[in-house]
Amino acid sequence: MDTIQIKDKKFTVSIKEQDILKEVTRVANEINRDLAGKNPLFLSVLNGSFMFTADLMKNITIPCEISFVKLASYQGVSSTGVIKEVIGITEDLTDRTVVIVEDIVDTGLTMQRLLDTLGTRNPKEIHIASLLVKPDKLKVDLNIEYVAMEIPNDFIVGYGLDYDGFGRNYADIYTVVDLSLIHI
């Protein structure tokens, strides 16, 4: 499908599944190399990162654990600026190597909140793996070590990303057709 309709918006394919999977495999290989012997805890940020996490973990070959956290800062097509932790972290992170797995880093505010929260639990080190990063939109300085792709400031759906809860199920990533209609 080259074009999809979700609610009142039309989207066109911008990143094909095979290109996504190639970059996810590259990121997994980097993590395998860098974190060998550290038994990392992968902390997947739901809901958006579920596809990225699944494909990433299929390619992680080092001993590891995985858990999930749910934070929210989006409503519709733009960040609300209000970050609310919905599902907390139950694991003991003391002296652990943690890898945050995120679908997209936009402003970075949600990621900074998560880093602050994790930091109070005394991990040995925290790494960030993100499928997508919008470098021109970042408002905070973050060390995102594992980035599959950098993208422009477009509104996108698919591969776990949604528009008001819809569109997460698509294997490709789609960009809204007329961004001028949306105020991000």
Describe these PLM feature segments.
Residues M1-I182:
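PRPP-associated nucleotide enzymes
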